[in-house]
């Protein structure tokens, strides 16, 4: 969960987000080393007279400043491609949920259960309980089992939306007439908050996403009670 004045990323709650945190640190270290080298060169040129302003040809320097950027790009690209393929990999998901974006709320349909679907609206400020978060709470949470591979099919009814939960490292555009998918697995129980991440109109900031991860047995009890209410 994010907190005020936070500078870093949220704590990882999924294997994909853990990989993204490692990649962030890896890329940040490369950026730091490059910035240090550039700053040193600028400082050296400003503070010393030991520079040659009249070099017309230097094959060694040209080779170095061609190879170094290529090596840096490879060091950034390979881990990035690995994570991209990891995100796209879908194999025997335990649960499939369809998330549909509307102006301005989300609707969820558990396709593995008959008649298990609901709309999820933002909880108004006057209805919040102590300890709940403004603009982030919903009247119906998307409840899922922890340590299970979840596939979410994402689309939109009207305009472009985007379904994003930072702690899980997932973000996917919801496009009218198109079905996108993402997969993730939550490592521990808890509440995970997200928001629509594509400007979709006047109430774009009032489209929160709340995921509640619970063990499998309580999830089965919850789904049974929801089906009984629907019947």
Swiss-Prot record:
Record's bilayer topology term: Multi-pass membrane protein
Subunit composition and interactions: Component of the cytochrome c oxidase (complex IV, CIV), a multisubunit enzyme composed of 14 subunits. The complex is composed of a catalytic core of 3 subunits MT-CO1, MT-CO2 and MT-CO3, encoded in the mitochondrial DNA, and 11 supernumerary subunits COX4I, COX5A, COX5B, COX6A, COX6B, COX6C, COX7A, COX7B, COX7C, COX8 and NDUFA4, which are encoded in the nuclear genome.
Stretches assigned to the Mitochondrial matrix side: 46-59
Name of this chain's protein: Cytochrome c oxidase subunit 2
Encoding gene per record: MT-CO2
Location relative to the cell: Mitochondrion inner membrane
Annotated Pfam families: COX2, COX2_TM
Any GO CC annotation of this UniProt entry: mitochondrial inner membrane
Family classification: Belongs to the cytochrome c oxidase subunit 2 family.
EC annotation from Swiss-Prot or TrEMBL: 7.1.1.9
CDD domains on file: CcO_II_C
Chief location category: mitochondrion
One MF annotation (Gene Ontology) recorded for this entry: cytochrome-c oxidase activity
Reaction(s) catalysed by this chain's protein: 4 Fe(II)-[cytochrome c] + O2 + 8 H(+)(in) = 4 Fe(III)-[cytochrome c] + 2 H2O + 4 H(+)(out)
Organism encoding this protein: Latimeria chalumnae
Residues annotated for Cu cation A2 binding in this entry: 196, 198, 200, 204
Transmembrane portions of the chain: 15-45, 60-87
Residues annotated for Mg(2+) binding in this entry: 198
NCBIfam families the record matches: CoxB (TIGR02866)
Stretches assigned to the Mitochondrial intermembrane side: 1-14, 88-231
Amino acids binding Cu cation A1: 161, 196, 200, 207
UniProt cofactor(s): Cu cation
